Curated annotation (Swiss-Prot):
Pfam families: ATP-synt_ab (PF00006), ATP-synt_ab_N (PF02874), ATP-synt_VA_C (PF22919). Belongs to the ATPase alpha/beta chains family. It comes from Shewanella halifaxensis (strain HAW-EB4). SUPFAM superfamilies: C-terminal domain of alpha and beta subunits of F1 ATP synthase, N-terminal domain of alpha and beta subunits of F1 ATP synthase, P-loop containing nucleoside triphosphate hydrolases. HAMAP family: ATP_synth_beta_bact. InterPro entries: AAA+_ATPase (IPR003593), ATP-synt_VA_C (IPR055190), ATP_synth_F1_bsu (IPR005722), ATPase_a/bsu_AS (IPR020003), ATPase_alpha/beta_chains (IPR050053), ATPase_F1/V1/A1_a/bsu_N (IPR004100), ATPase_F1/V1/A1_a/bsu_N_sf (IPR036121), ATPase_F1/V1/A1_a/bsu_nucl-bd (IPR000194). One of its GO terms (molecular function) is proton-transporting ATP synthase activity, rotational mechanism. It is found in: Cell inner membrane. Transmembrane segments: none annotated. This is ATP synthase subunit beta. It comes from the Bacteria.
Amino acid sequence: MSTGTVVQVIGAVVDVEFPHDAVPQIYDALEIKSEGLVLEVQQQLGGGVVRTIAMGTSDGLRRGLEVVNSGSPISVPVGSATLGRIMNVLGDPIDECGEIGEQERYVIHREAPSYEDQSSSTELLETGIKVIDLVCPFAKGGKVGLFGGAGVGKTVNMMELINNIAKAHSGLSVFAGVGERTREGNDFYYEMKDSGVLDKVAMVYGQMNEPPGNRLRVALTGLTMAEKFRDEGKDVLFFVDNIYRYTLAGTEVSALLGRMPSAVGYQPTLAEEMGVLQERITSTKTGSITSVQAVYVPADDLTDPSPATTFAHLDATVVLSRNIASMGIYPAVDPLDSTSRQLDPLVVGQEHYDVASGVQTVLQRYKELKDIIAILGMDELSDEDKTTVARARKIEKYLSQPFFVAEVFTGSPGKYVSLKDTIRGFKGILEGEFDHLPEQAFYMVGSIDEAVEKANKK
């Protein structure tokens, strides 16, 4: 327990001088007791001085304050005591419900599991959302990215996934709110409470108003809690909203530490920082971590270095499209842009694969015909193309679905659709079973039987 003094404060960066024989190691947690502030060592500058990032606001700090070295990295509570609680980056409760009362604490900087410990089995995870289960199925223990610009529904989709999977699979979830709105964190808490799944979710928040050091580490705090559940042999869902803010916090920290920026102003260590987080999100032979990460796409540009770096680590990508959202189709998932490593006949079965490919083929053909329709009208198309267009429009409408978490907005009850019903419905549309039904009957329904019922009512 060596002590040092603050020698320089530049925003969130604090330089601390220690005796030459007691210099803290990289990632050691230091504490300014008088301010109740934790610092994390990022660089050793020489001469006994270390450069640190503050985990809270540095307002009111001054030179000469005493700093104590804890001798180890930041540690957070883990285990069942964290369920139903909201914590900050340091694992302190922020829900006004008293102490966590944990039995054990883990440090947030840990090694990823070794290759021989990792699990290689493939098992599908049913989500109850038609478009996802059909076109970009999730693997249990896989990594999923929800890509989308501002306001296309990343957070709502994520909340629906938590709701469906927590109810259908009764697994444990860890939710890391990284640099998002405090209001969304509040909504999420009450949504989980009302759904009755709060006792299965641990929440860690480092919101928009927090300093960059806090936002950079909060994802690791959540992941550490998820790893503990996995090591106990449980299947865990790890949700991160939003992974882009994690990158952005890294950019801010990098600039404050004086590193030279790389492409588009991002930190030069972007790929490495992303890898450190993503490599730890993996399943072992004892338990699984299935992760769903919302990825904000700046200016709807998927080639931006941040989303592009994230792509490399994912098993499935769910791309949310502004064009589809503008048509009033929610979830606004683009079935042509979204991909999954699991969409393979050897994994999902031949029927599922054929139906998914058929849906994509019909939608792609409709996309190609749109220009002709816009210029010449529908009458100029061949009979075969007219049928394709009619079916594609039905498929587009049928890809929409009322969500449980959006009932207050849509006014219609949420629907969970099993994979079997999803395949049956789309197969029927492709084979022309429902050519006689109006396309509006397919909009915002659950199973295909509801669409038929809706059409018959009219």
